[in-house]
UniProtKB/Swiss-Prot annotation:
<protein>
    <recommendedName>
        <fullName>Protein A2-A3</fullName>
    </recommendedName>
</protein>
<comment type="similarity">
    <text>Belongs to the T5likevirus A2 protein family.</text>
</comment>
<keyword id="KW-0238">DNA-binding</keyword>
<dbReference type="GO" id="GO:0003677">
    <property type="term" value="F:DNA binding"/>
</dbReference>
<comment type="function">
    <text>Involved, together with A1 protein, in the second step transfer (SST) which allows the completion of viral DNA into the host cell.</text>
</comment>
<keyword id="KW-0244">Early protein</keyword>
<comment type="subunit">
    <text>Interacts with A1 protein; the two proteins form heterooligomers.</text>
</comment>
Amino acid sequence: MANVKTEKSAKFAWNEENTQQAVTMYQQLINENGLEFANSDGLKEIAKTVGAASPVSVPSKLTSAKAYQKSDKPRKVGGGSSIRKAHYVRVIAKHAIDSGIIKDADDLASLESAKLETLDAVAQLLGVADEVKQAAGE
Protein backbone atom coordinates (compact mmCIF):
# COMPACT_ATOMS: atom_id res chain seq x y z
CA MET A 1 0.00 0.00 0.00
CA ALA A 2 1.47 3.32 -1.06
CA ASN A 3 1.86 6.09 1.48
CA VAL A 4 -0.05 9.04 0.02
CA LYS A 5 0.54 12.43 1.58
CA THR A 6 -2.47 14.65 1.77
CA GLU A 7 -2.35 18.40 1.82
CA LYS A 8 -1.06 19.65 5.19
CA SER A 9 -3.45 21.68 7.25
CA ALA A 10 -2.31 25.23 7.87
CA LYS A 11 -0.23 25.51 11.04
CA PHE A 12 -1.32 28.00 13.65
CA ALA A 13 1.05 30.78 14.59
CA TRP A 14 0.49 33.60 17.03
CA ASN A 15 0.63 37.07 15.48
CA GLU A 16 -0.35 40.58 16.59
CA GLU A 17 -3.90 40.23 15.29
CA ASN A 18 -4.85 36.95 16.98
CA THR A 19 -2.95 37.92 20.13
CA GLN A 20 -4.98 41.13 20.39
CA GLN A 21 -8.17 39.16 19.72
CA ALA A 22 -7.27 36.70 22.50
CA VAL A 23 -6.50 39.53 24.96
CA THR A 24 -9.79 41.31 24.16
CA MET A 25 -11.81 38.09 24.50
CA TYR A 26 -10.05 37.23 27.77
CA GLN A 27 -10.84 40.63 29.29
CA GLN A 28 -14.48 40.36 28.16
CA LEU A 29 -14.78 36.88 29.68
CA ILE A 30 -13.41 38.17 33.00
CA ASN A 31 -15.89 41.07 33.03
CA GLU A 32 -18.89 38.94 32.04
CA ASN A 33 -18.22 35.60 33.77
CA GLY A 34 -15.45 36.14 36.31
CA LEU A 35 -11.81 35.12 36.55
CA GLU A 36 -12.45 31.44 37.40
CA PHE A 37 -14.44 30.88 34.20
CA ALA A 38 -12.01 32.92 32.08
CA ASN A 39 -9.09 30.80 33.33
CA SER A 40 -10.79 27.49 32.56
CA ASP A 41 -13.54 27.21 29.94
CA GLY A 42 -12.77 30.70 28.68
CA LEU A 43 -9.28 29.64 27.58
CA LYS A 44 -10.84 26.83 25.52
CA GLU A 45 -13.24 29.29 23.86
CA ILE A 46 -10.38 31.66 23.05
CA ALA A 47 -8.28 28.83 21.56
CA LYS A 48 -11.18 27.72 19.37
CA THR A 49 -11.95 31.29 18.21
CA VAL A 50 -8.39 32.27 17.27
CA GLY A 51 -7.61 28.81 15.86
CA ALA A 52 -4.91 27.86 18.36
CA ALA A 53 -3.93 24.20 18.22
CA SER A 54 -4.41 23.80 21.97
CA PRO A 55 -5.91 25.81 24.87
CA VAL A 56 -2.59 25.26 26.69
CA SER A 57 -0.86 27.88 24.53
CA VAL A 58 -3.42 30.58 25.36
CA PRO A 59 -2.39 31.35 28.99
CA SER A 60 1.28 31.57 28.04
CA LYS A 61 0.46 33.95 25.19
CA LEU A 62 -1.78 36.04 27.48
CA THR A 63 1.05 36.10 30.04
CA SER A 64 3.57 37.35 27.49
CA ALA A 65 1.00 39.99 26.44
CA LYS A 66 0.77 40.94 30.16
CA ALA A 67 -2.98 40.25 30.21
CA TYR A 68 -3.25 36.94 32.08
CA GLN A 69 -4.50 37.16 35.67
CA LYS A 70 -3.70 34.38 38.10
CA SER A 71 -6.59 33.02 40.13
CA ASP A 72 -6.73 34.20 43.75
CA LYS A 73 -7.68 30.89 45.27
CA PRO A 74 -5.38 27.90 44.92
CA ARG A 75 -6.64 25.01 42.83
CA LYS A 76 -7.41 21.89 44.77
CA VAL A 77 -5.49 19.00 43.35
CA GLY A 78 -6.84 15.54 43.97
CA GLY A 79 -9.78 14.98 46.18
CA GLY A 80 -10.83 13.84 49.54
CA SER A 81 -9.20 14.24 52.88
CA SER A 82 -5.55 14.44 53.77
CA ILE A 83 -6.17 11.99 56.61
CA ARG A 84 -4.63 8.65 55.72
CA LYS A 85 -5.22 5.18 57.11
CA ALA A 86 -1.75 5.31 58.65
CA HIS A 87 -2.80 8.27 60.82
CA TYR A 88 -5.67 6.24 62.29
CA VAL A 89 -3.52 3.16 62.85
CA ARG A 90 -0.71 5.15 64.52
CA VAL A 91 -3.06 6.91 66.96
CA ILE A 92 -5.01 3.73 67.77
CA ALA A 93 -1.75 1.78 68.23
CA LYS A 94 -0.32 4.51 70.48
CA HIS A 95 -3.35 4.28 72.77
CA ALA A 96 -3.25 0.47 72.73
CA ILE A 97 0.45 0.51 73.71
CA ASP A 98 -0.17 3.13 76.43
CA SER A 99 -2.96 0.92 77.82
CA GLY A 100 -0.74 -2.16 77.78
CA ILE A 101 -3.00 -4.00 75.31
CA ILE A 102 -0.21 -4.47 72.75
CA LYS A 103 3.56 -4.16 72.96
CA ASP A 104 4.36 -2.93 69.45
CA ALA A 105 2.56 -0.83 66.80
CA ASP A 106 3.27 -3.58 64.26
CA ASP A 107 0.65 -5.69 66.06
CA LEU A 108 -2.04 -3.44 64.54
CA ALA A 109 -0.42 -2.86 61.13
CA SER A 110 -3.03 -5.05 59.44
CA LEU A 111 -5.65 -2.41 60.31
CA GLU A 112 -4.37 -0.41 57.33
CA SER A 113 -6.17 -2.88 55.07
CA ALA A 114 -9.51 -1.75 56.54
CA LYS A 115 -11.61 0.89 54.81
CA LEU A 116 -10.96 4.51 55.80
CA GLU A 117 -14.61 4.88 56.90
CA THR A 118 -14.25 1.84 59.17
CA LEU A 119 -11.10 3.23 60.79
CA ASP A 120 -12.91 6.55 61.30
CA ALA A 121 -15.80 4.74 63.02
CA VAL A 122 -13.36 2.89 65.31
CA ALA A 123 -11.54 6.14 66.11
CA GLN A 124 -14.85 7.80 67.01
CA LEU A 125 -15.82 4.82 69.16
CA LEU A 126 -12.50 5.05 71.01
CA GLY A 127 -12.80 8.84 71.29
CA VAL A 128 -9.57 9.55 69.39
CA ALA A 129 -10.99 11.00 66.14
CA ASP A 130 -9.84 14.54 67.00
CA GLU A 131 -6.36 13.27 67.80
CA VAL A 132 -6.22 11.60 64.37
CA LYS A 133 -7.11 14.92 62.72
CA GLN A 134 -4.33 16.63 64.68
CA ALA A 135 -1.87 13.92 63.64
CA ALA A 136 -2.86 14.51 60.01
CA GLY A 137 -2.34 18.25 60.41
CA GLU A 138 -5.97 19.27 59.90
